[in-house]
Regions:
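Hydrophobic, aromatic-rich transmembrane alpha-helices
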Residues: 69-80, 144
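Membrane-interface loops
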Residues: 34-35, 81-154
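N-terminal transmembrane-helix/juxtamembrane module of multi-pass inner/ER membrane proteins
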Residues: 1-67, 107-109, 113-121
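Alpha-helical transmembrane segments of integral membrane proteins
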Residues: 9-12, 86-94, 156-163, 188
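Short helix-capping/hinge motifs at transmembrane helix termini and TM-loop junctions
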Residues: 27-31, 64, 82-83, 109-110, ...
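Membrane-embedded catalytic cores of phosphoryl/pyrophosphoryl-handling enzymes
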Residues: 118-220
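Alpha-helical transmembrane segments of multipass membrane proteins
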Residues: 17-21, 98-102, 170-171, 196-201
């Protein structure tokens, strides 16, 4: 797979990382974002129905870090079987590394999850940034980037990008609907996922450039 150049990737990383920091600071400082979080969650909670709840639970499963990790590992093994070592390493490193980063950030921020008198679901783990939003952004974003770089027809690449955006938005909405995250949690998860993707592709460029230079020196 051909990688993006480091310039655009580093710009995207800077913007996404900056947005993540702004959201984290807004949460910590108790800005009006906290009121938006509470109002949005309450508005959805009182309008929840069994049918929509079941649908959102299914959507949430498709964006779960555990689900996407299993898919990524299986995909990496398939790529290795097809002798696509670079693609296998990229897929596994980006997805597993993103999950580890999210785990670290959750324990650094230690934000509690939304609280309702009659919760649909409840979890004892930390809330910010959303692991589902991050994992979906990383996994489906990686597939979209692969399509952009490798699709033979442009419309196919655009369809892949639109599908990735739709999945990330739907998974993020499901987490707020189910009462497991604030809006700012999923916003932070998406920003984290974009920043991590951009960082990985910038790093991949420099690693491959170093390997090319080493190979050229060995041949000279």
């Amino acid at each position: 797979m051909r990688e993006l150049g480091p310039g655009p990737a580093l710009i995207v990383f800077s913007l996404a990382a900056g947005l993540f920091l702004v959201i984290a600071l807004a949460i910590g400082l108790g800005t009006p974002l906290a009121a938006l979080d509470a109002n949005a969650g309450t508005w959805l909670h009182v309008r929840a129905t069994p049918l929509v709840t079941n649908a959102m639970a299914a959507v949430s499963f498709l964006g779960a870090p555990t689900t996407l990790t299993i898919v990524a590992v299986a995909g990496s093994l398939l790529l290795l079987y097809r002798r696509m070592q670079s693609e296998a390493a990229t897929l596994s490193t980006v997805v597993l590394g993103g999950n580890f980063l999210n785990f670290c950030l959750k324990h650094l921020v230690q934000r509690g999850r939304p609280v309702f008198d009659d919760p649909i679901f409840s979890l004892p783990t930390y809330s910010f940034p959303s692991g589902h939003a991050m994992a979906s952004t990383v996994f489906y974003g990686l597939l979209a980037i692969y399509a952009l770089v490798n699709a033979r027809q442009r419309y196919a690449a655009y369809v892949a990008v639109a599908a990735a955006v739709f999945m990330v938005a739907l998974v993020s909405f499901s987490r707020v609907y189910l009462g497991l995250h604030y809006v700012s949690d999923v916003m932070g998860g998406i920003a984290e996922g974009i920043a991590w993707l951009a960082f990985c592709f910038a790093a991949l460029h420099y690693i491959r450039r170093g390997e090319s230079s080493t190979g050229a020196d060995a041949d000279s």
